[in-house]
Amino acid sequence: MQSREDVPRSRRLASPRGGRRPKRISKPSVSAFFTGPEELKDTAHSAALLAQLKSFYDARLLCDVTIEVVTPGSGPGTGRLFSCNRNVLAAACPYFKSMFTGGMYESQQASVTMHDVDAESFEVLVDYCYTGRVSLSEANVQRLYAASDMLQLEYVREACASFLARRLDLTNCTAILKFADAFDHHKLRSQAQSYIAHNFKQLSRMGSIREETLADLTLAQLLAVLRLDSLDIESERTVCHVAVQWLEAAAKERGPSAAEVFKCVRWMHFTEEDQDYLEGLLTKPIVKKYCLDVIEGALQMRYGDLLYKSLVPVPNSSSSSSSSNSLVSAAENPPQRLGMCAKEMVIFFGHPRDPFLCYDPYSGDIYTMPSPLTSFAHTKTVTSSAVCVSPDHDIYLAAQPRKDLWVYKPAQNSWQQLADRLLCREGMDVAYLNGYIYILGGRDPITGVKLKEVECYSVQRNQWALVAPVPHSFYSFELIVVQNYLYAVNSKRMLCYDPSHNMWLNCASLKRSDFQEACVFNDEIYCICDIPVMKVYNPARGEWRRISNIPLDSETHNYQIVNHDQKLLLITSTTPQWKKNRVTVYEYDTREDQWINIGTMLGLLQFDSGFICLCARVYPSCLEPGQSFITEEDDARSESSTEWDLDGFSELDSESGSSSSFSDDEVWVQVAPQRNAQDQQGSL
């Protein structure tokens, strides 16, 4: 052992006091951290205590206050009585805490009378105070919201708002908007407005006396909706039509507001094709009486004097001063509504680290869509995904082998994570049918056991359940929807699921040695099986038939078929070179029974060669350009493959690059798209 003098200078401690070592500070030993009495916690104590208090409440034991809930219009002594514990109510409910501890008159009374809440809602809320659980339904949710808002029960109030938001539909969206406005709930109001904007075209056609429509909105509510940029419409005429509908629903009372309402119409986006419609608009009595000058001024600014005079042969000279005011708003040139730029596009899903590509095969436009899987790419906890699209153009993505499920909202260009699935799987597929997401097939990622369980997710309730299992396990298969039935098909068998009876039925099998891809087109199932064989199944007749073979190329690496805007497309890619692959798109001619190369403009695609595709309606104005994923062929040939391997990709790319991330047999298994012909029709 070295002495102090023998220690090298570099290892000796420096001292500001002439080389003297600093005093050693006395610190407690390890045992000091474990002295004193041991503190233990009974993790079941709070739940057991609450359960016991609830049993006292049910048995009316040790209760110290009686709450009488009186129906509005009734006198004292006619209400329903609730025997409760002050401390429980005060601890759980801010309203009762103020009542019983704030020196109010009721704090000293054995009985308290309440008038502004109904007995049924109060019973549910008292149960919540004792249990932390609340039962919501369409019948009680609005009354519970009002009662919880009064009693300041924040959790119940927000649960009611979430319940209403998840049940928005065409028949109740305007009523929920009015409800949110009445209670000034900003989030619910925004969600209702977003739903109305997304379904504005359908709502503009509704006029049943049994349903609340856009005509039932107040002036302020209507103006807020008509001013939205996010209206999913193809023409500004739809906005004008709704404005007229609203005014004519109560012409006498609403007529004076006509000018303000029509200023929400973006006249600059009318075209010459709208001339007949505008001529009819100018002849409507409510327009001629209240706002002819406003509309004339806007049209003159939009079309100029020549076309304006053809629309309005004899301008109203007395309205020239007021029409000049409307020119200001027309000259602002507001943007197009969101729906005017909507397009059905082919979406490419590839490696988890990459964004998704949105491609129009006829115009060559390409954009990128964000991926929710990016954060998992480097951890390798997500190897692939399964995707499907709903009739409302929402894209659902299930990660593999994790339990995550996301939904993509095109108007917001964002992903929302939903409730976790019940099982981890790999090699599964997913489909959307009538408000439910179905997941089946694949195997357990740990044991490798093939799974027969079928998971079902309720979009409305954000909940999962297990439904009837498949009688045979599925791997290397496709899950597709035709009409109101679910079909699982592979090379050996095809099963049909009837959700109305929760049962699986056997169908005529494909009887092929290989299975590649399937999609729905014209209510029939098109399958690529033993390449280049294409077979078609007609569910109505229960028969298979063979059509023209798909184009065969020895260098083709990947085959995808999609239903794009009521056209059946075959998308192929070549074996990757320089980490890039050439993509070719063919359209099927049903009359001539042949595949036609439509002349894709993609060039060489720098993307995962094991991509899968589906079609969905998206909004290019919300997306980012995707040209960086395309390389001209001449540029690719000039690159050195050695330089590309060294400089173009990271270590992660070399380990799990697109050309080797999936085997040939697993490309279509691990990431399986859902293409529902009926769903695509809903996007037109």
UniProtKB/Swiss-Prot annotation:
A motif (ATG8 interaction motif (AIM)) lies at residues 668-671. Gene3D superfamilies: 1.25.40.420, Kelch-type beta propeller, Potassium Channel Kv1.1, Chain A. Residues 63-138 form the BTB domain. It is found in: Cytoplasm; Nucleus. One of its GO terms (biological process) is regulation of Rac protein signal transduction. Pathway: Protein modification; protein ubiquitination. Residues 1-27, 630-666 are annotated as: Disordered. Kelch repeats lie at residues 386-435, 436-484, 486-523, 524-564, 567-616. Signal peptide: none annotated. This is Kelch repeat and BTB domain-containing protein 7. The gene is KBTBD7.
